[in-house]
Amino acid sequence: MAVKGFKPTTPSRRHMTVNTFEEITTDIPEKSLLVALKRSGGRNAHGKITVRHIGGGAKRKYRIIDFKRNKDGIPAKVSTIEYDPNRSAFIALVTYADGEKRYIIAPVGLKVGDVIVSGADSDIKVGNCLPIVNIPVGTTIHNIELQAGKGAQLVRSAGTSAQLMAKEGKYATLRLPSGEVRYVRIECRATIGTVSNLTHEIINIGKAGRKRHMGIRPTVRGSVMNPNDHPHGGGEGKSPVGHPGPLTPWGKPALGLKTRKNKKYSDKFIIKRKNKK
């Protein structure tokens, strides 16, 4: 989990940092768990750009991740810890006692040779997956389901974890990484521990080329566009926005306006909204 810097041989190398990937044990993925990934370039079926700033980048193959962890009672041995280009966390290849191989999100502290298991009778040990009803209050967890059996949807990014705060009736109270406090059904599954790659958030990209390798294209400021391209465009030199507040390219209020629907079904499960930045 170390971060490496560089001598300032060029302006872009001055602040650039990279992960040393000390935890990674192999760079050859399991072929049976790879799927071809077709790039959209941000276009829909009609060829129109629906998501800006996407295109190019290094070719990738998708790693099929087991988010359900539904192979109960069968111990699995960690074979490798690997890099996944499709997510910020590292992944672990586990081999079950019956010979089946699966990828899981690797938690901090999981090493090659460790044995993990899923199911209600599992021990409270890093990497084990079990229903929230069987997890003690105060435990650090990740990879959390919102609907039992659907697969993990919450807390999957590098370095994140949630805390189990209480259990009452059919629901458990969780504090999420964003600061949000919400209810989750106690039959939903979660994995013990914190997601791997803790130093991900302090990596400095350093130069535009690394963003291009990731498939992210440049973002042009609206103020340097023409008035027919953006509400901020036009004027002589560095002109002000010309509106009470900043707007999106489509004329909607930007920066600070809440976009969540007022009457969303999940509002009743949220006790406290996420922290303001």
Swiss-Prot record:
InterPro entries: NA-bd_OB-fold, Rib_uL2_dom2, Ribosomal_uL2, Ribosomal_uL2_bac/org-type, Ribosomal_uL2_C, Ribosomal_uL2_CS, Ribosomal_uL2_dom3, Ribosomal_uL2_RNA-bd_dom. Keywords: Ribonucleoprotein, Ribosomal protein, RNA-binding, rRNA-binding. GO terms for molecular function: rRNA binding; structural constituent of ribosome; transferase activity. One of its GO terms (biological process) is cytoplasmic translation. The keyword Cell cycle does not apply. Transmembrane segments: none annotated. PROSITE patterns: RIBOSOMAL_L2. The keyword Ribosomal protein applies. One of its GO terms (cellular component) is large ribosomal subunit. Residues 222-277 are annotated as: Disordered. It comes from the Bacteria. One of the primary rRNA binding proteins. Required for association of the 30S and 50S subunits to form the 70S ribosome, for tRNA binding and peptide bond formation. It has been suggested to have peptidyltransferase activity; this is somewhat controversial. Makes several contacts with the 16S rRNA in the 70S ribosome. Belongs to the universal ribosomal protein uL2 family. Part of the 50S ribosomal subunit. Forms a bridge to the 30S subunit in the 70S ribosome. PANTHER family: LARGE RIBOSOMAL SUBUNIT PROTEIN UL2M, RIBOSOMAL PROTEIN L2. This is Large ribosomal subunit protein uL2. The lineage of its organism: Bacteria, Bacillati, Bacillota, Clostridia, Eubacteriales. The gene is rplB.
